Amino acid sequence: MLMFLTHFAEHVTPFNVFRYITFRTGGAMITSALIVFLFGPTIINSLRVRQGKGQPIRADGPQTHFKKAGTPTMGGLMIMTGILASCLLWANLASVYVWVVLMVSVGFGAIGFYDDYLKVTKQSDKGFSGKARLGIEFLIAAIAAFTIMRAGQEPFSSSLTFPFVKQLVINLSWFFILFAAFVMVGAGNAVNLTDGLDGLAIVPVMVAAASFGFIAYLSGNAIFADYLQIHFVPGTGELAVVLGAVIGAGLGFLWFNAPPAAIFMGDTGSLALGGMLGTVAVATKHEIVLAIIGGLFVMEALSVIIQVGFFKMTGRRVFLMAPIHHHFEKKGWTESQVVIRFWIVAIILAMIGLSTLKLR
């Protein structure tokens, strides 16, 4: 919205500042943080009254989790409110990439909201049907992938690039839609599985958002992209503004989610944020780098896949409990130890992922 003011920059020179992505990214970050800080208490109180018993606690989970009973969920509403309001104010609304990323985020968030609603009303961890949920997610993701492919420059719009290698590019043609949809849905559900402890998911999400904000800015700049030998994708630099809003909203949410949490993110937030990260990775042609930067999310998802698959084949478990953060709790780590150590892992993986921009 503020980009409109640049039309008057010839007469009001200070309006030129809104042309700069870096300035608007900072503005988006501050705005979303303030929105969550200011409206957070009201939203939390409203959810606490409406939800009554709050998010149900797993009966087979660590004993320390039972003291969290009664904590409201759907905290993703706070996060998404901050992100959407901030993006409407600071982002260039003429960018197709901004709208695609927000569409996936809102769509996935709506699925998560319905899932949270069912869990709270039924007081059960059995929410939305898994198959139906995945089906709708893939539909949303496929539409987004098609839009991204059509918006890009041929032949690179449907190609897959690899980190650490300059010239290795594979044109997936129409299979790109299936691959991209898998990345978006996988990212959404991986973040969802990570969100099991106070503050565990939101900090790695912010770390990944900061990393991909940097990548988006470089990918959308012809000079930087040429220097780093990465694909130049015109228009993706605007996604840095969106991810700046994510960081700000994440900081605001962490204020209330810090242990002992006053509210949980819920599927509403985790699916929305994960889907957003996956979509940004697809738009910037850094899908594989997402698996590195978001390696913590991959680890959490793989632990569940391995646990379920191994149990079905042998009747035994690999981990004491999945996702893997619960395994470490069962091993005797305190919740704060698990959370902070996983944050450290997320930061290290982000640095490794960003190093792929130069190590080619």
From Swiss-Prot:
Its main location: membrane. GO terms for molecular function: metal ion binding; phospho-N-acetylmuramoyl-pentapeptide-transferase activity; UDP-N-acetylmuramoyl-L-alanyl-D-glutamyl-meso-2,6-diaminopimelyl-D-alanyl-D-alanine:undecaprenyl-phosphate transferase activity. Its cofactor is Mg(2+). Pathway: Cell wall biogenesis; peptidoglycan biosynthesis. InterPro entries: Glycosyl_transferase_4, PNAcMuramoyl-5peptid_Trfase, PNAcMuramoyl-5peptid_Trfase_CS. Catalyzes the initial step of the lipid cycle reactions in the biosynthesis of the cell wall peptidoglycan: transfers peptidoglycan precursor phospho-MurNAc-pentapeptide from UDP-MurNAc-pentapeptide onto the lipid carrier undecaprenyl phosphate, yielding undecaprenyl-pyrophosphoryl-MurNAc-pentapeptide, known as lipid I. This is Phospho-N-acetylmuramoyl-pentapeptide-transferase. It comes from Brucella ovis (strain ATCC 25840 / 63/290 / NCTC 10512).
